UniProtKB/Swiss-Prot annotation:
The gene is pyrE. 5-phospho-alpha-D-ribose 1-diphosphate binds at residues 21, 88, 112-120. Its EC number is 2.4.2.10. This is Orotate phosphoribosyltransferase. Homodimer. One of its GO terms (molecular function) is magnesium ion binding.
Length: 183
């Protein structure tokens, strides 16, 4: 599967000057919602990501809301597991709503569309671990961390993409006066 081509085909690969959730600036942004809004593409991505973890026993898949909800669902479907999501708790962390089941000892896979620093998915992981879940792996459609994201368990992505990103003070796009778009 050519993941980058799916991003291009769906208009999900954007060029400009973007402020990422990580606080970094980048000339490129991967708008995964534009890709995942297509059920056939979403299912194909979920199947492919699920195959990377087919040998793990997974009770549930979790992702940060709202962007990861579809991804969690399609990967969980591929693995025959439950699909959960973690929401912002208003205090800088995330929580899992009542009604979404996490039993002590349940093995889980955390997924994210694009990992740059991994902070969003780490918050979802902490929420699941707080309910007794045991992390067995982290998956992403795209790893743009440059190999810097580490979770203490296997981390696998469909695509490793070297995309430049800069702290604000070192951003060449800021120096050139290119307007910044928050994403």
């Amino acid at each position: 599967m050519d993941v980058l081509e799916l991003y291009r085909r769906t208009g999900a690969l954007l060029e400009g000057h973007f402020l990422l959730r990580s606080g970094m600036h980048s000339p490129f942004f991967l708008q995964s919602a534009a890709l995942l809004q297509h059920p056939l593409y979403a299912e194909a991505v979920g199947e492919a990501l699920g195959k990377l973890f087919k040998d793990e026993k997974v009770d549930f898949v979790i992702a940060p809301a709202i962007g990861g909800v579809v991804l969690s669902f399609v990967v969980a479907k591929a693995l025959g597991a439950r699909a959960l999501f973690a929401e912002k708790d208003g205090r800088g962390g995330m929580l899992i709503r009542k009604g979404l089941t996490v039993n002590p000892g349940d093995r889980f896979l955390a997924v994210e569309d694009v990992v740059t620093t991994g902070e969003s998915v780490r918050k979802a992981i902490r929420a699941a671990e707080a309910r007794g879940g045991v992390l067995v792996g982290v998956g992403a459609i795209v790893d743009r961390s440059g190999g810097r994201a580490a979770f203490g368990v296997p981390f696998r992505a469909l695509l490793a993409l070297e995309v430049p990103h800069y702290p604000e003070e070192a951003c060449p796009l800021c120096r050139e006066g290119v307007p910044l778009e928050e994403v």
